[in-house]
Regions:
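ASCE RecA-like P-loop NTPase motor cores
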Residues: 1-428
């Protein structure tokens, strides 16, 4: 529910019950600024739940609105200029002739000093549950604590090592980490050359076995274009955030996860406030620091909340290629262009994509256009230096597209041939 949507619902509710105030702003400004203009105890006594017909037939009505207002009245200030309110609320059942048990929830709301709703939760009544089992789509423990009740004992029954063994051995998924950079592409810095080269090389190796990829939502069209340019007729992509429990790629031979995304500091601050923890971004206390580390007594909680979106988003993306245990003879390999995964999750690590410069492409284009050339001939017939020629050829000589006849040329020089000229190097 957006701030604007909640504002309209609260205004309509206040009008219906003829409250002493009439708007969302009247309420939250009093709480945030502490003006004391409103008697909150009196307002709490005025709160009532309208009859069910009002909820059924009023477009701006919502069954949780009375409880949300009560939670706001209970709000207290927390870290990062957030206010957190909570209440237990029994909401009206709108099903005609309903004769079942009451529906009770714990409502929690987080709003900031600008009067914007940051988080809004309706926690189910778990009192009759003997256990609640959470799947690995949301594995971070602080989020589980925030999304349930403090009275529920929480345990992680599968550790990350066991989880990876299950992915690799039972679901036949191999993960290859490419390079050692995070490649966080939430808003900018999508590495077009590296992604383009990786798509080209994967397509060349796996042919029709490579047709898909996953990246940040902002760059799905870029990834689709790179896949198309690599020869994929109808590329299929997913983006971080819509990949959970989607099995669209479970029959693919090879896949690409390009980069990762990270939550904003404000997003993590919302959860830190909700959990009543003490942590702040390191860059808030050190002007020269540009990373995403957190400091404070509960910095570890903030780091887990960061991992909930960054690391686990990449893991979920990789998992879209995993096979079911009913496919024991089939498997997939996923190339991950980010270093955010725990070391134990990468079955193999290869060097980062190396993008050729103009001189390197000139040298290799010359090799490709001639039927066997020596380094000396390249040096003589291009404007590349002798050292640049030798460095480029030595850099590429172990790749399958470059062939070398050792000592086959004049003065026992090596003779080089090329099947093609890629835009860069990567081991796939």
């Amino acid at each position: 529910m957006t701030t604007d949507g909640l504002r309209k619902k609260i205004k309509r509710y206040f009008t219906e019950i003829d409250a002493q105030i009439q708007t969302w702003e009247d309420l939250v400004v009093n709480i945030v600024q502490g003006t004391g203009d409103i008697d909150l105890d009196q307002l709490r006594e005025e709160l009532e739940v309208p009859d069910t017909d009002w909820f059924r037939y009023n477009r701006e009505a919502h069954a949780l609105t009375p409880g949300i207002v009560e939670a706001i009245i209970h709000a207290e200030e927390r870290n990062h200029d957030r206010w957190v309110g909570e209440t237990r609320y029994t909401f009206p059942t709108l099903i005609p002739n309903y004769d079942g048990p009451e529906h009770e929830v714990i409502l929690r709301i987080v709003f900031d000093s600008e009067y914007h709703v940051r988080l809004l939760q309706a926690i189910p009544d778990f009192t009759e549950a003997r256990s609640v089992i959470g799947l690995d789509a949301h594995p971070t423990m602080p989020k589980w604590k925030a999304n349930t009740l403090s009275s529920i004992e929480k345990n992680q029954i599968i550790n990350s090592d066991d989880n990876h063994k299950w992915r690799r051995n039972q679901r036949n998924l191999t993960i290859v980490q490419v390079g050692d950079n995070k490649n966080t592409w939430t808003k900018k810095d999508f590495s077009d050359p590296k992604v383009r080269i990786l798509c080209d090389e994967l397509r060349h190796k796996y042919e029709n076995g490579f047709r898909t990829g996953i990246t940040a939502k902002r760059f799905t069209k870029d990834l689709q274009q790179h896949l198309t340019n690599a020869g994929v007729d109808s590329p299929d992509t997913l983006y971080f955030g819509n990949e959970k429990s989607v099995e669209d790629f479970d029959s693919e031979q090879a896949g690409l996860v390009a980069g990762c995304i990270s939550p904003s500091s404000d997003h993590i601050k919302d959860w830190i406030a909700l959990l009543d923890k003490d942590a702040k971004p390191k860059r808030d206390v050190e002007d020269s620091y540009q990373g995403q580390k957190w400091v404070g007594e509960d910095a570890d909680v903030a780091e887990e909340l960061l991992a909930d979106i960054r690391e686990n988003g990449v893991l979920q993306a990789c998992g879209r290629y995993a096979r079911s245990p009913q496919q024991p003879d089939d498997g997939a390999i996923v190339y991950v262009l980010t270093n955010v995964l725990p070391d134990e999750y990468a079955d193999k690590q290869v060097d980062d994509v190396s993008v050729f410069g103009k001189k390197e492409m000139q040298i290799l284009d010359y090799v490709l256009s001639h039927d066997g050339v020596t380094p000396n001939r390249i040096d003589q017939e291009t404007d590349a230096s002798r050292k640049h020629v030798h460095d480029t050829l030595n850099k590429c000589r172990d790749y399958s597209w470059l062939h070398v006849d050792e000592n086959a040329g004049e003065y026992n020089a090596d003779v080089f041939y090329a099947d093609r000229r890629p835009d860069g190097l990567v081991e796939v």
